[in-house]
Swiss-Prot record:
Keywords: ATP synthesis, Cell membrane, CF(0), Hydrogen ion transport, Ion transport, Membrane, Transmembrane, Transmembrane helix, Transport. F-type ATPases have 2 components, F(1) - the catalytic core - and F(0) - the membrane proton channel. F(1) has five subunits: alpha(3), beta(3), gamma(1), delta(1), epsilon(1). F(0) has three main subunits: a(1), b(2) and c(10-14). The alpha and beta chains form an alternating ring which encloses part of the gamma chain. F(1) is attached to F(0) by a central stalk formed by the gamma and epsilon chains, while a peripheral stalk is formed by the delta and b chains. This is ATP synthase subunit b. It is found in: Cell membrane. The lineage of its organism: Bacteria, Pseudomonadati, Pseudomonadota, Gammaproteobacteria, Enterobacterales. One of its GO terms (cellular component) is plasma membrane. The chain crosses the membrane at residues 12-32. Pfam families: ATP-synt_B (PF00430). The keyword Cell membrane applies. Belongs to the ATPase B chain family. GO terms for molecular function: proton-transporting ATP synthase activity, rotational mechanism; proton-transporting ATPase activity, rotational mechanism. F(1)F(0) ATP synthase produces ATP from ADP in the presence of a proton or sodium gradient. F-type ATPases consist of two structural domains, F(1) containing the extramembraneous catalytic core and F(0) containing the membrane proton channel, linked together by a central stalk and a peripheral stalk. During catalysis, ATP synthesis in the catalytic domain of F(1) is coupled via a rotary mechanism of the central stalk subunits to proton translocation. It comes from Wigglesworthia glossinidia brevipalpis.
């Protein structure tokens, strides 16, 4: 066997093999590699987009939390203001009730004072009448007795009037 013919045959077989591979196998491998490259590029883009979406979502969540905190503070402030108003109204109402009770008590005291004065005048007049009667009964001089009676009656009239 001739080495040149063998090498030449192997070279032809190699070129046929390379041609066959380039014609039928290589395009499939290249298309698989391209599809894989596209899938990887698409996955990387999706990952970048997901990162961006996550960042945006975090910012939105932060803004919502801040908004909720502001709303909570506003609600608390409104509740405090309402509480203050209710307390003020309750104080005013309590003061009105207190003043009403005090004025009613004063009126009751004045009424009681008037009633007691009337009772006292009545009792004094009764005592005076009784003492005058006793004086008259024990008195000998009618003129003196009449004078005493007239003074007593005038004093009683002054007390009543």
């Amino acid at each position: 066997m001739n080495i040149n013919a063998t090498i030449f045959g192997q070279t032809i077989a190699f070129f046929l093999f390379v041609f066959f591979c380039m014609k039928y196998i290589w395009p499939n491998l290249i298309s698989l590699v391209e599809k894989r490259r596209e899938n990887i590029a698409q996955a990387l883009n999706e990952a970048k987009q997901a990162k961006l979406n996550l960042k945006i979502s975090k910012e939105k969540a932060k803004k919502r939390i801040e908004s909720a905190q502001i709303k909570c503070k506003n609600i608390i402030n409104e509740a405090n203001e309402t509480k203050k108003l209710l307390i003020e109204e309750a104080k005013k109402e309590a003061i009105k009730i207190k003043e009403h009770i005090i004025s009613q008590g004063r009126l009751d005291i004045l009424d009681e004072k008037k009633r007691m004065c009337e009772d006292l005048k009545t009792k004094i007049s009764e005592i005076i009448v009784m003492s005058v009667e006793k004086i008259i009964e024990s008195s000998i001089n009618k003129k003196i007795s009449d004078n005493i009676i007239e003074r007593s009656i005038s004093k009683i009239n002054k007390i009543k009037g």
